[in-house]
């Protein structure tokens, strides 16, 4: 398998599938933080220890197949170009921290990109499983099975009283971070999100932007995750998050219907204006593109737009990010060059989708 696939394909195989409640929940993710005995944690380890850990995982897991996920490939951060690392961040396959601050970092990626094992990030390894739509329980089951498989080859740092030991005290215990990516345009438009976020925080959950801590909720996409990892089982943590997410889904759907009733043609106009911008613009910044894609996605969900699939918007959401644009261009681009390239790419992709739809109708 060539590494090029990871950098040149915007939509991972798992993301092209429709999951439950995928009109609102883009993806579910389970991440497990683990450390290996006999090695100091990444906050204290030497460069020699870091390289030994990478060598251990390369020797043990690289090029091995795992179930339906396919074969693992090891990517070392030191061997990747800055644009390539940015692409992996934009696809949510690695964290910004691994890309930018881990000189001895690496990542094991499965062929279908459903599984990512980050090495030498904040912990020795961070196991990540991604599923489309609202599938937290399924993602947890997959991550737990993978965790057991890995533990058959390495010894984890574990304390009978505390649980799994991690670099950051907030991860001690289960080492589990469960999260969902949600598209919540109606809650933003009605400003209900301003009331909902503090309420969610009080329940021990965290609301972040598209790329996690410190990032902005571009295109009305929010990441909701647990904060507590100690004193609860993995199943309870996931069940609690699932309950809150279901409530958010119900609130978003109710807000959408309220907007249809109160705004009517104005909401439809907003959707088609955004579609018009995307289909005809010659220059567009990433923030405006994300907002227009959000409006069009809402229009598809409400039945206003019928000739575009939601999958195309998932693709454009990633294709229009700075890293991917530069990967497509074959090198670094100035911001103004990226804006021109982004506009051209969106126009071209929407025209292709319209042609595909017309050909399908003719048949």
UniProtKB/Swiss-Prot annotation:
It catalyses: L-arginyl-[protein] + ATP = N(omega)-phospho-L-arginyl-[protein] + ADP + H(+). GO terms for biological process: phosphocreatine biosynthetic process. Its EC number is 2.7.14.1. PROSITE patterns: PHOSPHAGEN_KINASE, PHOSPHAGEN_KINASE_C. Residues 24-255 form the Phosphagen kinase C-terminal domain. It comes from the Bacteria. InterPro entries: Arg_Kinase, ATP-guanido_PTrfase, ATP-guanido_PTrfase_AS, ATP-guanido_PTrfase_cat, Gln_synth/guanido_kin_cat_dom. Transmembrane segments: none annotated. A motif (RDXXRA motif of the pArg binding pocket involved in allosteric regulation) lies at residues 338-343. The keyword Transferase applies. It is an enzyme of class 2 (transferase). Keywords: Allosteric enzyme, ATP-binding, Kinase, Nucleotide-binding, Transferase. GO terms for cellular component: extracellular space. Belongs to the ATP:guanido phosphotransferase family. This is Protein-arginine kinase. It comes from Geobacillus kaustophilus (strain HTA426). The lineage of its organism: Bacteria, Bacillati, Bacillota, Bacilli, Bacillales.
